[in-house]
């Protein structure tokens, strides 16, 4: 059982991801912005982070910069929706995201990515 940190400012997205990931026997931590996500990562050292890009206070890209500055080998899957998502996801890849998903996405594909990233 892996610990997965889900970071998204939209509670319905977090709830959906929690349901899917817990159904696959993972423990899920939740944060609504990058600041809280960084705090949880430091306190709990999850095995994987799934983060949205566009969030208030500290967005996913800013959080990824901080994560890579402070910690080694952080596994991140980035997701984004909206008009700027394609460019933001390219930047996320450059910052070290292992996988990227444009919202809306297929939960089966995300779950496959989670399993792959946890195994490698």
What is each of the regions a protein language model found here?
Residues 79-80:
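Hydrophobic/aromatic residues positioned on beta-strands within the core alpha/beta folds
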Residues 11-29, 95:
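Two-component/phosphorelay signaling modules centered on CheY-like receiver
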Residues 8, 52:
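Active-site residues of response regulator receiver
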Residues 62, 83-101, 112:
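Alpha4 helix (beta4-alpha4-beta5 surface) of REC/receiver domains from two-component response regulators
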Residues 32-36, 59-63:
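Acidic catalytic/metal-coordinating carboxylates
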Residues 55:
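Receiver (REC) domain active-site loop signature in two-component systems and cognate sites
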Residues 105-115:
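C-terminal output helix
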Residues 44-50:
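Active-site beta3 strand of CheY-like receiver
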């Amino acid at each position: 059982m892996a610990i997965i940190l889900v970071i998204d400012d939209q509670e319905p997205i977090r709830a959906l991801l929690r349901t899917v990931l817990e159904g696959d026997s993972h423990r899920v931590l939740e944060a609504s912005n990058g600041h809280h996500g960084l705090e949880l990562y430091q306190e709990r050292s999850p095995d994987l982070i799934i983060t949205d890009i566009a969030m208030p206070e500290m967005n996913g890209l800013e959080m990824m910069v901080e994560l890579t500055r402070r910690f080694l080998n952080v596994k991140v899957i980035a997701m984004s929706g909206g008009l700027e998502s394609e460019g933001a996801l390219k930047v996320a890849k450059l910052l070290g995201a292992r996988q990227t998903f444009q919202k809306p996405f297929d939960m089966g594909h995300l779950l496959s990515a989670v399993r792959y990233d946890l195994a490698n």
